[in-house]
Design a protein with these regions (language model features):
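Gly/Pro- and small hydrophobic-enriched strand-loop and loop-to-helix capping segments
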Residues: 62-64, 126-139
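Flexible, glycine/proline-enriched loop segments at strand-loop-helix junctions
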Residues: 107-108, 132-136, 163-166
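A cross-family phosphate/adenosyl-ligand binding-site feature
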Residues: 1-100, 139-178, 182-195
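Active-site/ligand-binding-proximal alpha/beta "capping" segment
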Residues: 92-127, 134, 185-193
Length: 195
């Protein structure tokens, strides 16, 4: 029997300047729960992290939180996760999150979100995994970043095929459905232990 779709969501520990960000984070969580899926995320209880986790739990989904000891108090760890893993380092956090996921999805966030997105994108281009990566461009948040990335292509530092590794969308259900289809929903056996 195939396991449920497990998606690693990267997003802000803040809600951002517009309510649309939290609304879309909750839509992501509701989709995961309604599809008997599993959220893997950074284990926080605030901002978009808290919104997506709450909505997943309220909709019947599983929530796997992974948080370093040093951030437990700072990010107000979500103690009612289905599973909450307190790890030693950020590297341990990212490795466990990657291992537990069938796909990755970046919602709006700050430099931590950017770093996580770029890391799994780099791993994908290098062949460390073949899991799909989505970018939810809520309220045009990622528009300037996408323009910059196209500039990098135009200047010869990236190729179009690298851009093609990202699934970009503004509608949570459509993007999540595409990621689930592309992932094989639990069939990937990538090993992140040597990264």
């Amino acid at each position: 029997m195939k396991q449920a779709f497990s998606v690693c969501v990267y997003c802000g520990s803040r809600t951002g300047a517009t309510p649309e960000f939290a609304t879309l984070a909750r839509e992501v969580g509701r989709w995961i729960g309604a599809n008997d899926g599993q959220l893997v995320y950074g284990g926080g209880n605030t901002g978009l992290m808290g919104a997506v986790a709450d909505a997943t739990l309220e909709s019947g989904g599983r929530v796997v939180g992974v948080i370093p000891k040093a951030l437990v108090e700072r990010e107000f760890a979500k103690l009612d996760c289905t599973e909450l893993h307190v790890v030693d380092t950020m590297h341990d956090r990212k490795q466990m999150m990657a291992e537990r996921a069938d796909a990755f999805l970046a919602l709006p966030g700050g430099i931590g979100t950017f770093e996580e997105l770029f890391e799994v994108w780099t791993w994908r281009q290098l062949g460390y995994h073949d899991k799909p990566i989505g970018l939810l461009d809520a309220a045009g948040y990622y528009g300037p970043l996408l323009a910059f990335l196209q500039s990098s292509v135009a200047h010869g530092f990236m190729n179009e095929w690298q851009m093609g590794l990202l699934r970009i969308g503004s509608e949570p259900a459509t993007l999540l459905s595409q990621l689930a289809r592309d992932s094989g929903a639990g069939t990937d056996e990538s090993d992140f232990s040597d990264i």
